[in-house]
């Protein structure tokens, strides 16, 4: 127990002396600056030892400044510019048939009714003839569908009637055969019963006692 107390006192004294030395700013203490300087010097020596001369990279020629874009080149900025939608006093080449321009799109978005240009109804995508042809084809398809449905219903009704008549005919034949069989059985029963009646009549007659004879004088 005494030894344990002495050990505790020695540890406490050692810790107190360490704290006093740190508080007084002893030069022998640990400083972060010394560690940083030591690592930097080591790094410099390592770089000095391991550095090797490298082959200089190939120099690239400076890129030529891009000239003005050609008229045929596509530029996304042209699509965002509203002035490009105008004609700029240039006549656009005529395109065969009807077309859909930005003006038509603005009319639709603005709530106005779309009115195609006159004389442009015979193009690739528009025209009264195409609408008439589509209407006629739709009507023809509807009529064909109705006619096929009616034909299938009629065929089903005829086949059902034929099968019903066949079943009815088979049942009638079966009933006729059953009736003939019953009649035959009845005739056999009658024929078998007649001899029995005669035999029973003869048997009753034989069992009766003979009449008494009259007395003789």
UniProtKB/Swiss-Prot annotation:
Source organism, top-level taxon? Eukaryota
Q: What does UniProt give as GO cellular component? A: anchoring junction; extracellular region; plasma membrane
Q: Which residues lie on this side of the membrane: Extracellular?
A: 26-141
Disulfide linkage:
none
| Single biological process term from Gene Ontology | cell adhesion
Q: Which residues does UniProt assign to the signal peptide?
A: 1-25
Is the keyword Transmembrane helix assigned to this protein?
Answer: yes
What residues bear carbohydrate chains?
A: 134
- What task does this protein carry out? Plays a role in a late step of leukocyte extravasation helping cells to overcome the endothelial basement membrane. Acts at the same site as, but independently of, PECAM1. Homophilic adhesion molecule, but these interactions may not be required for cell aggregation.
| Protein name listed in UniProt | CD99 antigen-like protein 2
Gene name of the encoded protein: CD99L2
């Amino acid at each position: 127990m005494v030894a344990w107390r002495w050990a505790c006192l020695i540890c406490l004294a050692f810790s107190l002396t360490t704290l006093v030395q740190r508080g007084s700013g002893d030069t022998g203490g640990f400083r972060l600056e010394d560690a940083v300087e030591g690592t930097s010097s080591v790094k410099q020596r390592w770089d000095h030892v391991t550095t090797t001369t490298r082959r200089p990279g190939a120099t690239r020629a400076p890129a030529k400044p891009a000239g003005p874009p050609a008229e045929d080149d596509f530029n996304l900025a042209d699509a965002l510019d509203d002035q490009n939608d105008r004609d700029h006093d240039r006549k656009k080449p005529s395109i065969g048939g009807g077309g859909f321009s930005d003006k038509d799109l603005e009319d639709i978005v603005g709530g106005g009714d779309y009115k195609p240009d006159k004389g442009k109804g015979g193009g690739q995508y528009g025209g009264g003839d195409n609408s008439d042809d589509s209407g006629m084809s739709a009507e023809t398809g509807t009529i064909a569908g109705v006619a096929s449905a009616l034909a299938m219903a009629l065929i089903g009704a005829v086949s059902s009637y034929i099968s019903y008549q066949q079943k009815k005919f088979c049942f009638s034949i079966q009933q006729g055969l059953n009736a003939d069989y019953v009649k035959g059985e009845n005739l056999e029963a009658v024929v078998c019963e007649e001899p029995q009646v005669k035999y029973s009549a003869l048997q009753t007659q034989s069992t009766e006692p003979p009449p008494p004879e009259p007395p003789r004088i």
